[in-house]
């Protein structure tokens, strides 16, 4: 049965986009940027913005006051704006895009299987001259109708690379609106580590993000820019009928030996000091938690 599901999707191309179609799923890649711009199930579009690279985070107290990340690593804050499409190729049910700029080369590959599972592969190369990023990942806005979540990973509350040992691995669920806490001073929040899958669902169905390896994920009711700009919770500009979903390879730890000097940064083991990062995850229809779990099992063990 899985051999049949591996057949190539139908690829169609226009000046503006490349479309992959298989069964009830249509995935669209923007021909100008190389980014995934649409994921529709049975004609219902679930994405509200393109899936774009993210190397930054809304500054934590330690980032702002001690590590001073805006001064030391500020190039990463606007790096996505400097990435320009270098090549875009479509063949055998897959689209490969390469974007470059600012000392960064990022290759993204989207492959749609006949059962609607869209594999997203990410390969990042960083120039030696660049400082370390705070995050390696992708983010997009998804339909606000996806008002419930289920995930398999560490929880139930937020946790980070250097703050996760007390968070037990399990399956957690709730209202999407409650996924991330609200800090008095808005900042990075809501991350979950070692996530096998995250399902978001509503009355009309759902979607799952399942990793070939453990992921970091978070879901916010606002953009990262809005979170970073506000100084009080009531100042956060909230999204209208959308959730921002981060699906990340990794994020730096929060540190905190103190909060007023460079000692506030995380130890080297929890910083992103490598110059090459790669990961892969699948986006697939998932109307129930059982659907999400089955997809995750297939994805995680595909190459074993």
Residue map of PLM features:
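Beta-strand/loop-rich accessory regions of lumenal/periplasmic or secreted enzymes
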Residues: 2-304
């Amino acid at each position: 049965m899985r051999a049949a599901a591996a057949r190539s999707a139908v690829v169609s191309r226009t000046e503006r986009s490349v479309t992959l179609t298989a069964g009830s799923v249509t995935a669209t890649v923007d021909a100008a940027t190389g980014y995934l711009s649409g994921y529709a199930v049975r004609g219902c579009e679930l994405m509200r913005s393109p899936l774009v690279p993210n190397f930054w985070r809304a500054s934590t107290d330690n980032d702002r006051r001690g590590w001073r990340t805006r001064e030391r690593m500020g190039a990463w804050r606007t790096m996505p704006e400097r990435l320009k499409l270098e090549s875009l190729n479509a063949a055998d049910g897959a689209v490969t895009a390469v974007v470059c700029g600012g000392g960064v080369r990022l290759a993204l590959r989207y492959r749609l299987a006949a059962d609607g599972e869209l594999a997203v592969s990410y390969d990042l190369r960083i120039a030696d001259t660049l400082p370390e990023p705070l995050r390696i990942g992708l983010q997009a806005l998804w339909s606000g109708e996806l008002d419930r979540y289920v995930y398999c990973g560490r929880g139930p509350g937020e946790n980070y690379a250097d703050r996760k040992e007390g968070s037990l691995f399990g399956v957690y669920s709730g209202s999407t609106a409650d996924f991330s806490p609200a800090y008095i001073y808005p900042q990075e929040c809501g991350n979950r580590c070692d996530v096998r899958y995250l399902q978001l669902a509503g009355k009309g169905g759902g979607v799952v993000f399942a990793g070939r390896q453990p992921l970091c994920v978070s879901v916010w009711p606002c953009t990262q820019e809005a979170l970073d700009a506000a100084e009080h919770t009531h100042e956060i500009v909230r999204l209208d009928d959308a959730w921002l979903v981060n699906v990340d390879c990794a994020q730096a730890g929060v540190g905190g030996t103190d909060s007023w000097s460079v000692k506030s940064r995380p130890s080297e083991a929890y910083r992103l000091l490598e110059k090459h990062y790669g990961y892969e995850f699948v986006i697939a229809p998932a109307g129930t938690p059982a659907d999400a779990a089955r997809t995750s099992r297939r994805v995680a063990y595909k190459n074993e």
